Structures are given as C-alpha cells and as structure tokens.
Amino acid sequence: SSDAFTLVEEQVAYWVGGDRIATSLEVAGWTTFEWLHFLAQLPQSLTTSQLAELDQAFELTSSGNAEIVHQWLLIAIRNDYLPTRDRLERYLLAIGRRKLVLPLYQAMAETADGRSLAMNIYRQARPGYHPITANSVDAVLGWSE
C-alpha cells in the first residue's frame, strides 16, 4: 500500500538525513516490495562507509532474495563497493534470468574496471545462460567467441 511506501520513505529520510543509524530504522516485517522501495529511494551516490553500514545492519549482500540482491548489487556496482564482488560473481553464475543479469552487466560496462570484471564473470557464466540472455549480454559487452 502507499502508506507502507510512505513509511519506507520516512526511514530512508531518517537515515540519509543522519537522524538515525541503519540499525535503528523501523524495518521489522517489511515485505520484498518494501525492501525494493527502500533500495530504490536511496541516493544514487553513497560512500563505502554508508554501504557498509546498510550491509551490516540488513545483511543485503547475503540476502536469499534474488530481487533484493539484484537491487543491492546495482547500488554496489554504481558506487564501486568492493565487498560485494564475490557475491556479484556467485549471483551472475547462479541466476540466469535476463531481467536480473542484464542490468548488472550494463552497470559494470560503464567503467573500464567494471567491464573487465564483467568479461571475467561472463566468460564463466555465459554457457549457462539462455541464448536470448547471452545475446543481450553479448551486445552490452561486445562479446565475441
């Protein structure tokens, strides 16, 4: 409901504004949709210490929810948050859904370091992807056999 999303937005504002630390945010009982909304409402640019605080408080890197991990990894890639690198690789090797893997490769492809990482992961992951997914990632990375 929109009321639930308003409460999520309040928690983001408290944290971003420095009024509350992550562990004091009211997140008990949040659904996947509320967590996704929380992650979507975060500022585009976050520091390593801010990301570490969120990760330690909410265990986002180790979440078992593919959608939540997807959003978290996008944020991590955008902000060059290195502690998620192993999880990113495991995720891209385990998940084959185009809608979950393509945006991650696109985000990595925006920087030279990211593109290099993407190519290394993709070299291993590509054989397990559906041909449509592989074709999409091929185009993003300029992949050729």
Give the positions of each predicted feature.
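Long, ordered, helix-rich scaffold segments
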Residues: 1-145
